[in-house]
Amino acid sequence: MSIALLDIEGTVCPITFVKDCLFPYFSKQYPSYLRDVSFPIDKSDGGLADVLAGFPKEAVASIDQLKNHIDDLVARDVKDPVLKSFQGLVWKEGYAKGDLKAPVYEDAIAFINRSKSVYIYSSGSVGAQKLLFSHVDVNGASVDLTPKLKGYFDITTAGFKQEKDSYLKIAADIGCDPADVIFYSDNVLEVKAALEAGMASKVVVRPGNAELSESDKKSYECISSFTAE
């Protein structure tokens, strides 16, 4: 396969990084971003208001209602495009300050470095993906892997990850046949959708990932490292 399409959490970095590091960092920091926002939010205000105005009208009527809405989305891990954009803004500053570095697995770093055509597909925004891969933790230093990546896809540019059509769109956007792509993910339903679209696909098994059923282990090709890929 000449083109690799990679999921992020649970695949190239620990699933705990997002839930135990990025999400808590966002939840702690985001209220400070709302101090200068006027409520009810009007998109014409510009700046951050343009992003937040994408939330339901009732959610942006007051700062307390907005906080409740955001906290609920985060708690339920809802893949909301507006939330993802706001998170990306907060994380951008966190990476810039050195508060955040991405713990990408060594075998994944080596795979990206030796591969000729690697794309990323995550439910996190493209902006957040670029931030993560431009601030990879290598022995305490922040390393930029983005020059090795050919492109990025998220739920706004490609669609939801458990839908076959999303993978067909990605192949079309890359300009290749789906059969030329191999998709790696820890999520069996995502792997299933990619296979249905005609891509090759493998389930990535990492510490902390959801346990695979015996049926899934037999039905899908599984790897625990990119070393042999």
UniProtKB/Swiss-Prot annotation:
> EC?
3.1.3.77
* Chief localisation class: cytoplasm
- Pathway of this protein? Amino-acid biosynthesis; L-methionine biosynthesis via salvage pathway; L-methionine from S-methyl-5-thio-alpha-D-ribose 1-phosphate: step 3/6; Amino-acid biosynthesis; L-methionine biosynthesis via salvage pathway; L-methionine from S-methyl-5-thio-alpha-D-ribose 1-phosphate: step 4/6
Task: Explain how, and how many, cofactor molecules are bound.
Answer: Binds 1 Mg(2+) ion per subunit.
Where in or outside the cell?
Cytoplasm; Nucleus
Listed InterPro entries: Enolase-ppase_E1, ENOPH1_eukaryotes, HAD-like_sf, HAD_sf
List cofactor names only.
Answer: Mg(2+)
Any GO MF annotation of the entry: acireductone synthase activity
The entry marks the following residues as binding Mg(2+), namely D7, E9, D186
Any one GO CC term of this protein is: nucleus
Reactions accelerated catalytically? 5-methylsulfanyl-2,3-dioxopentyl phosphate + H2O = 1,2-dihydroxy-5-(methylsulfanyl)pent-1-en-3-one + phosphate
Sorted keywords for this record are: Amino-acid biosynthesis, Cytoplasm, Hydrolase, Magnesium, Metal-binding, Methionine biosynthesis, Nucleus
For substrate, which residues are the binding ones? S122, S123, K161
Q: Which SUPFAM superfamilies match?
A: HAD-like (SSF56784)
Query: What Gene Ontology biological process does one annotation of this record name?
Result: L-methionine salvage from methylthioadenosine
The record describes its quaternary structure and partners as: Monomer.
Record function comment:
Bifunctional enzyme that catalyzes the enolization of 2,3-diketo-5-methylthiopentyl-1-phosphate (DK-MTP-1-P) into the intermediate 2-hydroxy-3-keto-5-methylthiopentenyl-1-phosphate (HK-MTPenyl-1-P), which is then dephosphorylated to form the acireductone 1,2-dihydroxy-3-keto-5-methylthiopentene (DHK-MTPene).
Family label? Belongs to the HAD-like hydrolase superfamily. MasA/MtnC family.
Name this protein carries in UniProt: Enolase-phosphatase E1
Give the organism, scientific name: Clavispora lusitaniae (strain ATCC 42720) (Yeast)
Point out the gene that encodes the protein: UTR4
